[in-house]
From Swiss-Prot:
<keyword id="KW-0720">Serine protease</keyword>
<keyword id="KW-1015">Disulfide bond</keyword>
<comment type="function">
    <text>Protease that shows preferential cleavage after Arg and Lys residues.</text>
</comment>
<keyword id="KW-0378">Hydrolase</keyword>
<comment type="similarity">
    <text>Belongs to the peptidase S1 family.</text>
</comment>
<feature type="site" description="Required for specificity">
    <location>
        <position position="211"/>
    </location>
</feature>
<feature type="active site" description="Charge relay system">
    <location>
        <position position="82"/>
    </location>
</feature>
<feature type="disulfide bond">
    <location>
        <begin position="67"/>
        <end position="83"/>
    </location>
</feature>
<feature type="disulfide bond">
    <location>
        <begin position="213"/>
        <end position="242"/>
    </location>
</feature>
<dbReference type="InterPro" id="IPR033116">
    <property type="entry name" value="TRYPSIN_SER"/>
</dbReference>
<feature type="disulfide bond">
    <location>
        <begin position="187"/>
        <end position="202"/>
    </location>
</feature>
<dbReference type="GO" id="GO:0004252">
    <property type="term" value="F:serine-type endopeptidase activity"/>
</dbReference>
<dbReference type="GO" id="GO:0006508">
    <property type="term" value="P:proteolysis"/>
</dbReference>
<feature type="active site" description="Charge relay system">
    <location>
        <position position="127"/>
    </location>
</feature>
<feature type="active site" description="Charge relay system">
    <location>
        <position position="217"/>
    </location>
</feature>
<feature type="signal peptide">
    <location>
        <begin position="1"/>
        <end position="41"/>
    </location>
</feature>
<dbReference type="InterPro" id="IPR001314">
    <property type="entry name" value="Peptidase_S1A"/>
</dbReference>
Amino acid sequence: MTHTTTIAAKRGGLALAKKAAAAGAVALAVASLQPVSAAHAADARVIGGKPAAQNEFPFMVHLSMGCGGALYKKDIVLTAAHCMDGSGNNTRITVTAGVADLNSSGAIKVKSTKVKVAPGYDGVGKDWALIKLAKPIDRPTLKIATTAKYNRGTFTIAGWGDVREGAGTGTTKLQKANVPFVSDRACKWHYGNRLVPKQELCAGYASGGIDTCQGDSGGPMFRKDDAGKWIQVGIVSWGDGCARSGVPGVYTEVSTFAKDIAKAASAL
């Protein structure tokens, strides 16, 4: 990715991002990891993070096409729309849960049965999707934010994506890191009209160095609520590069779509 022709990449792979048509609008960027589609998803991990302990984030899941996700219900995974190939019956996805190390003998593997992509998703905003599982996974679920109350502060990101931009190798050990909220105004300074403020959140350090990357797409961005419990505020969506100085990662704003997600889940 060059500075003269900036290409936004979904955090699930090195494929062109949903907003690549606006290439060149930004000079530098720090990207999150997401693939444009399941067919092009690439494994990746959190940059600048450290290994997560077993059971530290028991709601985290890994998807076989190279994306992440979180247990919304014990039999439903919340992930990114750009990781999917559309809605409908789908038995091709293998969901791995219950472990921080994907090579662990204790890994729980369950197949998908259906996928529901956000209604009206066209690659710009609305980057969420649900995966119905063949059977429930007996692990804790991750509550999602239903208001914007928790959309500021410091967030936790986690994933099995690249630890270096362009690595394309991912990691078998879950990585974690913390990133601060970035205002819409500051984020638009970098992304311009490619950002959809009402539907997306930005997070990252001005100095770069810590970010999601290819292979982290679909994973949750979360923080503690007033009761000290984890709550999901974002979904790893897209960005320009990974952990570059001066450009934050972009995440789906979960609270905006909470009612739509609940409605879609009840119909799966």
